[in-house]
């Protein structure tokens, strides 16, 4: 389960095993990054260890500004939705959709259209998440 409390337990166990001898935590999403950061806070390591997540959750953006989370992966939802709608219409009209890659699902190569994602840091937060209207600046910078 991608729950913050589970991530905190896993991070606590990892810290107990590694001590302070590690550089980064690559979390599956921003919620689990938040759980891992709670473990880091308990050990006095928050802001000293690189922590990544994905989804650009509001809390993650606030942690990025605060210095406890290094980055998040942002997927521009408006662009994704527009592209998905365009492809759905094409498929409904039996028009071709050009795959830009393929994904091996273990049984076959599935044609895939990959969409560019953005690594969001303190330096580009305003130009990405805020500029797209995903989160308002006053909610992030409080």
Where are these regions (language model features)?
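Hinge/beta->alpha junction and helix N-cap segments in small-molecule ligand-binding domains
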Residues: 1-10, 26-32, 55-58, 75-80
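Short, well-structured alpha-helical segments in soluble
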Residues: 5-21
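Venus flytrap/periplasmic-binding-protein-like
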Residues: 26-30, 34-69
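Short, charged, surface-exposed secondary-structure boundary motifs
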Residues: 60-63, 81-85
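Short beta-strand elements at the ligand-binding edges of bilobed clamshell
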Residues: 66-78
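Hinge/cleft segment of the Venus flytrap/periplasmic-binding protein
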Residues: 83-142
């Amino acid at each position: 389960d991608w729950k913050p409390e589970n991530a905190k337990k896993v991070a606590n166990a990892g810290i107990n095993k590694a001590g302070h001898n590690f550089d980064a935590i690559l979390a599956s999403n921003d919620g689990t990054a938040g759980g891992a950061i709670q473990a880091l806070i308990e050990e006095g390591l928050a802001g000293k260890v690189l922590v990544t997540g994905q989804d650009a959750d509001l809390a993650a953006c606030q942690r990025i500004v605060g210095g406890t989370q290094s980055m998040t992966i942002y997927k521009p939802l408006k662009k994704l939705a527009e592209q998905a709608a365009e492809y759905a219409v094409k498929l409904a009209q039996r028009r071709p959709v050009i795959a830009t890659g393929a994904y091996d699902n273990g049984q076959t190569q599935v044609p895939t259209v990959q969409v560019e994602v953005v690594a969001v840091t303190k330096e580009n937060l305003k130009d990405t998440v805020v500029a797209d209207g995903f989160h308002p600046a006053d909610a992030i910078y409080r």
